[in-house]
């Protein structure tokens, strides 16, 4: 391929200076280039969200969040040996506390002090939890970045199909012995080109090459030389790699961005449902603690009354032991409930991205979602039409079908058409400037064919993609079946929760009637009767509270599994037409009545 450059020493110096300036400009434009990439990434994300519809949102890339990196980093000497801190057992210390015998009263006082609420705790509502998670949750940020990476991969693939400019400047020094003295020369070569991939395979390119040589020894004659050349080339496949299969990487990258948009939107729905479940569980645990505290108080009252009966000789002494035992069991259960609640709060804070050492107070929230009318046939139809994961699973079958076509195309022979044209300056003129001589125009057209004598690897890939296609079809049908099971389970879950609520309401009423009957005739009831009645009332109240929580979650699960859940950009549930969404908040939701 012809090369050309600048002729005289001044031109060589100018070319060298131009190359240095170009390098500096390239380094200085890195930041602006990254800003352009961020803008284009956001544009792709916006278009994918708009294509998805349904009020979908998209994250916006923020370059300030990421490590900028260094062009020439200086690493520490031990960079290949990261330090590990793992001291032997002899360097560690274990300090045991002395065993102290405590009675029930001292245990109660110490436990109440340990579980006392922090007055400086930050109140956390469900809405504020959602808002905090959207900004700080590692899980949510990872989902956003997964979406961003799909857009970046599309940009990278689209860039491969855009005109790609290149410019290479090289400066060389050459010395050659002439018998009595050395001849020294300085040469500068600049190659400016652009290439473009063709939509149906192959590529075209154009390059402008200049070459200049400056003789540094002018003791006899100056042998300075300069030439230019313009080269146009096209390489077009006619069999393997020809046609629409050439665009498969670009097609797949664009489809992958659509899949990423669906996955992110489905993640937002799942995230809302799971956070709602976590929060309602915390509220349920708070109510369970209130129920446990009430049982401890009632058990202590039964214990005091039984002691009085024993002291008056109206009952056997072992009845007092039974009452004491029940109080201790109630205290132990309350201790376990409080510890389980603290553990749940720490896990909830961790999921929100909040430091676990921060003190928070959960503000009780109760959803007031209307019970939907469930028609199983219609629900399944909605799920098959609207569920984003099913749509992606269906479209993956098309992806694997195209991969089979690409693999089949790769089994063909290579038949390529090469066209090249080289226009250069007059080689008989030492310094030709930027002028071309049509008399020195070279044109080449060549057709080459490579027979497919060895296509074993390609045949294996074809069979592999055919198997993967069948697996994707089965995967789609399995996903449909799994979705149908989930929809049916969600519909039955609503009915199950309604039934459980009705049963537990009657159970609570029966337990309270039992307790009232014992209170009306205390002398006829033993300590066992009283403690059994308290346990039954606590279990009934806990079961009723759990049924209420399960009903609200069952409604949310039904909306999500049928593809009808919609979430605002702020992370809140969007009511469907005909659906009224209400929330009750505040400490008054926790029943602390004696």
Q: What residue ranges belong to the model's regions?
A:
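Acidic, low-complexity, intrinsically disordered peripheral segments
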Residues: 31-82, 346, 355-377, 423-429, ...
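Amphipathic alpha-helical coiled-coil scaffold segments and their short linker/junction regions
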Residues: 133, 195, 315, 319-324, ...
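A glycine-/polar-enriched beta->alpha junction
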Residues: 35, 132-142, 148-163, 191-221, ...
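Regulatory alphaC helix of protein kinase catalytic domains
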Residues: 71, 82-132, 136
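Amphipathic alpha-helical coiled-coil segments
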Residues: 143, 147-157, 267-294, 301-303, ...
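Small/polar, glycine/serine/threonine/aspartate-rich low-complexity segments that form flexible
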Residues: 112-122, 169-233, 363-376, 404-405, ...
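C-terminal motif of bacterial Sec signal peptides marking the signal peptidase cleavage site
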Residues: 26-29
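Hydrophobic, small-residue-rich alpha-helical packing segments that form membrane-like cores
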Residues: 172, 186, 226, 230-239, ...
């Amino acid at each position: 391929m012809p090369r050309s450059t600048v002729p005289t020493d001044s031109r060589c110096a100018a070319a060298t200076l131009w190359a240095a300036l170009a390098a500096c400009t390239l380094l200085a434009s890195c930041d602006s280039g990254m800003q352009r990439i961020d803008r284009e990434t956001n544009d792709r994300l916006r278009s994918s969200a708009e294509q998805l519809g349904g009020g979908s949102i998209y994250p916006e890339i923020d370059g300030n969040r990421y490590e900028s990196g260094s062009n020439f980093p200086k690493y520490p000497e031990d960079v290949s040996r990261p330090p590990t801190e793992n001291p032997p057992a002899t360097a560690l210390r274990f300090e045991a506390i002395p065993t102290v015998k405590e009675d029930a009263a001292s245990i109660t006082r110490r436990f109440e002090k340990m579980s006392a609420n922090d007055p400086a705790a930050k109140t956390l509502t469900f809405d504020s939890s959602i808002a905090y998670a959207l900004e700080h949750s590692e899980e949510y940020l990872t989902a956003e970045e997964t979406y961003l990476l799909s857009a970046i991969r599309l940009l990278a693939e689209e860039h491969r199909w855009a005109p790609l400019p290149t410019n290479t400047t090289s400066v060389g020094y050459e010395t050659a012995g002439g018998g009595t003295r050395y001849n020294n020369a300085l040469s500068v070569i600049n190659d400016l080109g652009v290439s473009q991939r063709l939509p149906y395979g192959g590529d075209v390119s154009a390059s402008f090459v200049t070459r200049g040589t400056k003789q540094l020894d002018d003791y006899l004659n100056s042998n300075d030389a300069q030439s230019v050349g313009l080269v146009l080339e096209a390489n077009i496949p006619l069999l393997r790699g020809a046609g629409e299969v050439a665009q498969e990487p670009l097609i797949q990258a664009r489809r992958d961005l659509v899949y990423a948009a669906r996955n992110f939107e489905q993640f937002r729905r799942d995230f809302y449902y799971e956070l709602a479940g976590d929060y309602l569980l915390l509220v349920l645990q708070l109510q369970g603690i209130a129920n446990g505290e009430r049982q401890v108080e009632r058990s202590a009252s039964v214990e005091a009354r039984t002691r009085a009966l024993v002291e008056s000789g109206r009952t056997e002494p072992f009845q007092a032991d039974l009452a004491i035992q029940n109080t201790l069991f109630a205290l132990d259960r309350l201790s376990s409930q409080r510890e389980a609640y603290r553990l749940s709060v720490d896990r909830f804070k961790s999921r929100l991205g909040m430091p676990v050492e921060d003190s928070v107070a959960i503000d009780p929230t109760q959803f007031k979602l209307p019970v939907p009318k469930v028609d199983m046939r219609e629900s399944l139809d909605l799920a098959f039409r609207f569920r984003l994961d099913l749509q992606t699973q269906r479209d993956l079958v098309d992806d694997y079908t195209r991969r089979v076509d690409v693999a089949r195309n790769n089994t063909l022979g290579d038949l390529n058409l090469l066209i090249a044209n080289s226009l250069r300056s007059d080689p008989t003129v030492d310094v030709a400037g930027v002028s071309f001589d049509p008399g020195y125009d070279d044109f080449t057209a060549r057709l080459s064919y490579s027979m497919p004598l060895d296509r074993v690897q390609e045949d294996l890939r074809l069979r592999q993609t055919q198997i993967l296609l069948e697996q994707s079809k089965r995967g789609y049908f399995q996903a449909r079946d799994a979705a149908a099971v989930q929809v049916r389970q969600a519909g039955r879950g609503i009915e199950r929760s309604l039934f459980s609520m009705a049963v537990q309401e009657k159970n609570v009423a029966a337990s309270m009637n039992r307790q009232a009957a014992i209170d009306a005739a205390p002398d006829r009831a033993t300590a066992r009767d009283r403690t059994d009645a308290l346990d039954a009332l606590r279990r009934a109240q806990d079961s009723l509270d759990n049924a209420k929580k399960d009903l609200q979650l069952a409604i949310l699960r039904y909306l999500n599994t049928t593809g009808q859940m919609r979430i605002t950009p702020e992370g809140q549930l969007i009511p469907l037409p005909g659906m009224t969404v209400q929330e009750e908040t505040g400490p008054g939701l926790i029943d602390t009545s004696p």
